[in-house]
Amino acid sequence: MSRRKARELALQALFQMDIAGTDPDTAVAQALTRETEPDWAPDRLEEESAEFARRLVRGAWQHREESDRLIAQYARGWRVERMAAVDRAILRMAVYEIVHSEDVPDSVAVAEAVELAKTFSTADSSRFVNGILGSVIRGMKGAAGADEAVSRD
């Protein structure tokens, strides 16, 4: 299983958690179970990808309030709770990766989120997701630059 597939599974779990109130461990287990074949035997790479999916789900869910604040800040004219649930899950996962995952470049997090939006949401969602995430990144870099300027004084 690739990281892309792990993100798809994480998206399914986050969507289920948001809509049905399922706990993170159950949602991930159900997403992984749906994905497996009867003769499936996890190898090392597959277990690493499954763990990546678990980490994304737990992290995105744990930090959803922080992510929602960032999303709301840059989603002009949109309230997070009024967004399509799948878009909200994609954005939460991507913001979590951008803010908290040092092993994932911002550009990869955005590209993967855009691909998820193209696959699982509406025709306009990929542009919507791309625009919000780009603004989040620019806002964070601007804040980091301001912090550096203040600390040098």
Curated annotation (Swiss-Prot):
Function field: Involved in transcription antitermination. Required for transcription of ribosomal RNA (rRNA) genes. Binds specifically to the boxA antiterminator sequence of the ribosomal RNA (rrn) operons.
Highest rank taxon of the organism: Bacteria
Single GO MF descriptor: RNA binding
Protein name per UniProt: Transcription antitermination protein NusB
Similarity-based family: Belongs to the NusB family.
Lineage: Bacteria, Bacillati, Bacillota, Clostridia, Eubacteriales
Family matches, as InterPro entries: NusB-like_sf (IPR035926), NusB_fam (IPR011605), NusB_RsmB_TIM44 (IPR006027)
Gene3D superfamilies membership: NusB-like
Any one biological process term the GO annotation gives: DNA-templated transcription termination
Species for this entry: Symbiobacterium thermophilum (strain DSM 24528 / JCM 14929 / IAM 14863 / T)
Gene: nusB
GO CC, any one term: cytosol
